[in-house]
């Protein structure tokens, strides 16, 4: 991360992690690599503007039991997926004090996702699924807060975030399945609806160049509930 002007800094980052999803007999695990470029511009003490680009590559292993009438077959496959995201966010800083920060914000993001197809077999029949590429846009209106305090020699900040997110664009994931050579069917996933997100976390400044954070993220709408825990160790140089 470097300062390119009095009020602007830019940086690059790299990350790695794992993702696991389960739904009925379906399970997928992936190893994820993230790289990105970001920037921050402060407008006096009134507002801040974040912007950037993130690319994620996932190498996934999946399995499930496919059932067709009275037949069932256990299948495993591997594949790759790529996700590209461009984002921008503006936050108002006029409520901040030395004792706490409270920042309303509005953000926009564009997300492009593509993944490999896969084949499954049951009772001598083969079914091939090819997911369609997906372009999704997200708008977010929220508020975040932070309270700094000291814990021994470490400077610690307790953070919270609450937002409402609206999805538009390709809000239904689609794939085409070849039905054992007898035709092709269009498969649609559940449509993404407006979603509330909640974040709670704590971040400690371990040294001038190192920070450690632990956080929880939850997402909720009428049909979907998601929970996530994240530990983050960051070194600046």
List the model feature ranges, each with a label.
Residues 19-29, 57-85, 111-139, 167-179, ...:
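Extracellular/periplasm-exposed beta-strand and loop segments of Gram-negative cell-envelope proteins
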Residues 1-97, 213, 217, 221-223, ...:
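Outer membrane beta-barrel translocator domains of Type V secretion systems
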Residues 6, 45, 49, 55-59, ...:
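Membrane-insertion modules used to breach or fuse lipid bilayers
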